[in-house]
Amino acid sequence: GWNAPEYEQMGLWPGETFYASRYEFASEYLSILNDLWTTGRSDRKSQFWNLNDCYCLPMPDYPIPIVSAGQSPAGVEFCDQHADQRLVIGQPKVLDQLELRQKSGSLRKYQTYILLHMIVEKTDEKAKQVGEEIIRKADKVAIANMISSAQLDSNKGGSSEGVKISLDRPLEEGNSAFTAIPVIHGSPATVAMKLDAMAEKTGADGFMFSWNDFEVGIRAFGQEVLPRLTCV
């Protein structure tokens, strides 16, 4: 990841070069895992690793799927090479990229899942009001810390760039109060309509959601939104 303070507090941050090399690090790590999963041992020597007769038993009976987040050019390339499922934050520019990729007819190895924050209320107006109230009450100190960390990332075009945006962004575009995750909001019918349109536009294989209150949110989605979806 790019959030250096999370690693520095435990003495685990490798240094500034890791911003640019983290996908190479991850690729080598996956190569080691594949050695262990397919042969049970690894002696792999590489830029980041120096293994000597390492074992991992028992070996899996079937291929283990690789799930990876990837939005920057380097992240997308990593997914192209290694991932079975790719996770993306559903910001408008990302949705446009997915649409272009779908229209191009290019083959892809992995499935794509879009991350959104969901607010479902009885009316569209109430749902928007709830979202805007969260922005008004946002923890500005925490957001400032998050932005300062994101600004250090030298890997351009990834999720850290989305984090740098301000509290002035519309809910749908990924406001900092929601850690740059776009909010899909409205009545059950409106939310279902938006999800169907997004699925058709992007060809996404699925969605991931976060909620203000996950118990209430999951119940509302399952009982009121899911039955209205045509994309499932």
Give each language-model segment a name:
Residues 72, 77-86, 92-97:
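Long hydrophobic segments that form regular secondary structure
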Residues 37, 70-71, 90, 211:
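Residues that line or immediately flank small-molecule/substrate-binding pockets and catalytic motifs
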Residues 165, 195-197, 205-222, 227:
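Substrate-recognition/cap regions that form aromatic- and gly/pro-loop-enriched pockets
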Residues 66-69, 84-88, 110-117, 205-209:
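Hydrophobic faces of well-ordered beta-strands that scaffold small-molecule active sites
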Residues 3-7, 11-62, 91-202, 230-232:
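An alpha-helical appendage that flanks or caps ligand/catalytic pockets
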Residues 29, 75, 79, 191-198, ...:
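Alpha-helical packing segments of well-folded alpha/beta enzyme cores
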Residues 33, 66, 79, 127, ...:
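Conserved, mostly hydrophobic/aromatic
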Residues 80-85, 176-181, 204-211:
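Glycine- and acidic
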